[in-house]
């Protein structure tokens, strides 16, 4: 599909600009893909926020915090009543903050706050990696009581997104790192509705904007 709608069309030299604005997919084609497993309603159920807007934040600095420092920051955020916390897209499994250590420290803080207040913050842990790695990381998050995972779309590619979408038992937060390269020129590239439809079809429950 991507090769057909956004392949060599962009290489046609006589065109000074070409932009993909939207997609209308035949029902029979769209139904071949599962799409989001949870969507907004499922995400709200996991987050315990049935109606109002979710209040969220991103762990900063992007990289450099240890797993313990990340857990301490998450504890403060939970004490403040946050609904949604996500890893920065640069934070995956680096030496300063290994993925498994970060999950353990973060979920310790989340679960302790939930025991006190009855409110369990949703944390989107960045799984981005090779397919087998992402599956293992997803399972680790699930084992520690996590309620969300995250992938960098351009990093894992369409096949990676489809695979983790089939495997997941948790909502997937999809990060659009690199999106600017596809859309900054108003006469060239993709519109966000067209681009996001493909990733939703592949299994993304919500898109970072």
Predicted feature descriptions by range:
Residues 36-46, 92-113, 131-134, 153-169:
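Active-site-adjacent beta->alpha loops and helix N-cap segments on the catalytic face
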Residues 69-80, 102-114, 158-166, 192-201:
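Structured alpha-helical segments in the cores of large, soluble enzyme domains
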Residues 50-54, 80, 118-121, 146, ...:
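Short coil/turn connectors at secondary-structure junctions
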Residues 53-71, 121-132, 179-190:
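Active-site mouth loops of central-metabolism enzymes
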Residues 135-138, 144-209:
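Catalytic alpha/beta core domains of metabolic enzymes, predominantly
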Residues 57, 64-91, 97-98, 110, ...:
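Phosphate-binding glycine-rich loops and their immediate beta-loop-alpha structural context
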Residues 1-79:
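N-terminal capping/small domains of soluble enzymes
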Residues 53-60, 85-87, 121-127, 149-151, ...:
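Hydrophobic faces of well-ordered beta-strands that scaffold small-molecule active sites
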């Amino acid at each position: 599909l991507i090769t057909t709608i956004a392949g060599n069309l962009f290489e046609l030299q006589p065109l000074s600009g070409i932009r993909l604005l939207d997609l209308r997919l035949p029902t029979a084609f769209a139904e071949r893909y599962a799409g989001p497993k949870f969507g907004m309603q499922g995400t709200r159920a996991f987050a315990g926020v049935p109606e109002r807007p979710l209040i969220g934040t991103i762990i900063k600095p992007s990289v450099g915090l240890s797993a313990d420092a990340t857990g301490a920051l998450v504890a403060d955020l939970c004490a403040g009543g946050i609904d949604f916390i996500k890893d920065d897209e640069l934070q995956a499994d680096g030496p300063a903050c290994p993925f498994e250590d970060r999950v353990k420290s973060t979920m310790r803080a989340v679960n302790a706050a939930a025991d006190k207040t009855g409110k369990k913050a949703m944390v989107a842990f960045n799984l981005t990696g090779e397919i087998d790695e992402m599956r293992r990381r997803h399972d680790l998050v699930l084992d520690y009581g996590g309620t969300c995972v995250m992938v960098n779309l351009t990093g894992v590619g369409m096949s990676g997104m489809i695979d983790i979408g089939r495997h997941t038992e948790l909502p997937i937060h999809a990060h659009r790192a690199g999106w600017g390269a596809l859309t900054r020129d108003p006469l060239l590239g993709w519109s966000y509705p067209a681009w996001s439809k493909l990733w939703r079809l592949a299994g993304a429950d919500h898109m970072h904007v």
